[in-house]
Amino acid sequence: METAFSHPPQSSSSKRKVIAVVGGGLVGSLNACFLAKRGFDVEVYESREDIRQAKVVKGRSINLALSHRGRQALKHVGMEDKIISKGIPMHARMIHNVNGKRSPIPYGKKGQYILSVDRANLNKELLTAAEAYPNTRLNFNHKLHDWSPKTGTMTFIGSDGQKTETQADLIVGCDGAFSAVRKQFLRQSRFNYSQTYIPHGYMELTMPPKDGDFAMEPNYLHIWPRNTFMMIALPNLDRTFTCTLFMPFEDFEKIRTGDELLRFFHKYFPDSVPLIGVEALKQDFFRLPAQAMVSVKCCPYHLFEKCVLMGDAAHAVVPFYGQGMNAGFEDCLVFDEIMDQFNENLVAVLQEYTRVRVPDDHAIADLAMYNYIEMRAHVNSKYFIFRKYLDNLLHFFMPKTIVPLYTMVTFTRTRYNDAVNRWHWQNKVITRGLWLCGFVSAAGGTYVLVKNSHKLPSISAEQLWTRILALKLF
């Protein structure tokens, strides 16, 4: 019996396949490069106008952190060097305390860094790269209205309201968290889907240059952690910083006037006020309402042999691990590797892609949720900082045995799911080791005290307790 996610026999036709990429954003445009490089006829359909010609760029503008996974995908299509040249290295987190003190926390080993890149510029570069292939065509102002999972026929609505039909051998849905392609999946049985909005929104502010240079150290991801909310700042090539305030919606709604805004910032982010500027802060804050963030999970990623989901269409993640774009780019690379493995047999390729990629993408979605708590709360903890240094120290002496989670996720292509499983195992080992060290130290101290008790001055239990309290240990 055939289900929506089983496959009828594939045609043995030798005709080159037509692949439709729905969505001309970051993942869609990179995917077009991968597929065109293989010799497929690629049609890219984007609902918006060409971002390279738009006077005003609509959509999200949160700065992006490009790391190893994304770079490997770009390298595969010859784009890594060009993109890196327009990025700014960030070697560590810079933690800003309320009192103005700054403390760096390195991301990894010396020489390891992530890159701050501009979303719009990256999208433009990838579209231009895709368009350079003679077997690729970009179609803008084409909004997907419906499509058939049986025939691969798609209906688009143009900017003039007219409908057009076209057909493809494979439809690749790269059209974001609110994917129109994915709607067809929802009509099928045995398709699992969930979305979760977090109770926090985000708002972007701009920190201008100071005396023609960066207002803060540029090679850091700056973080102002405040337990239930936080602000971050990433550097831009024009020497500005894009600051993003993440906070519960109800807290945003409490700030209604410029005076309330200034009181809030002077209380929680005092060092940022003179750097952003009072008037600029007010203008940016009240320009637009706080934006929502959603996490999307679904399974499987393919439908018959006609369609596959990638990027946010398959796994939108909240932006707190800096892996949303990197995971989407790795989707393209993994799909390409599986195409090699199965000699471009789409029946086998799509099934394997779902099998391999779903657990990894779900793992990074969960990690992104966890990391929000870490970024806004745990980085203030002395134990957190101690564990970071301990993990890095153990990694230095035992590089193959102990690998920090952030290192596995950001600086390697270890599968996300494997990284999480290994992290849990390492935590158990390290925690038990710390408890053992504590027990041995306590036992050793007790033994020394007992052995030398006759040398100690006589003191009552009440006096001993009073002296302990005086040390303010509790």
Swiss-Prot record:
Its main location: mitochondrion. One of its GO terms (cellular component) is mitochondrial outer membrane. It catalyses: L-kynurenine + NADPH + O2 + H(+) = 3-hydroxy-L-kynurenine + NADP(+) + H2O. Its cofactor is FAD. The chain crosses the membrane at residues 393-412, 433-453. One of its GO terms (molecular function) is kynurenine 3-monooxygenase activity. Its EC number is 1.14.13.9. Keywords: FAD, Flavoprotein, Membrane, Mitochondrion, Mitochondrion outer membrane, Monooxygenase, NADP, Oxidoreductase, Pyridine nucleotide biosynthesis, Transmembrane, Transmembrane helix. It is found in: Mitochondrion outer membrane. Pfam families: FAD_binding_3 (PF01494). Coiled coil: none annotated. It is a multi-pass membrane protein. GO terms for biological process: 'de novo' NAD biosynthetic process from L-tryptophan; anthranilate metabolic process; kynurenine metabolic process; L-tryptophan catabolic process; NAD metabolic process; podocyte development; quinolinate biosynthetic process; response to yeast. Pathway: Cofactor biosynthesis; NAD(+) biosynthesis; quinolinate from L-kynurenine: step 1/3. It comes from the Eukaryota. HAMAP family: Kynurenine_monooxygenase. PANTHER family: KYNURENINE 3-MONOOXYGENASE. Belongs to the aromatic-ring hydroxylase family. KMO subfamily. This is Kynurenine 3-monooxygenase. The gene is kmo.
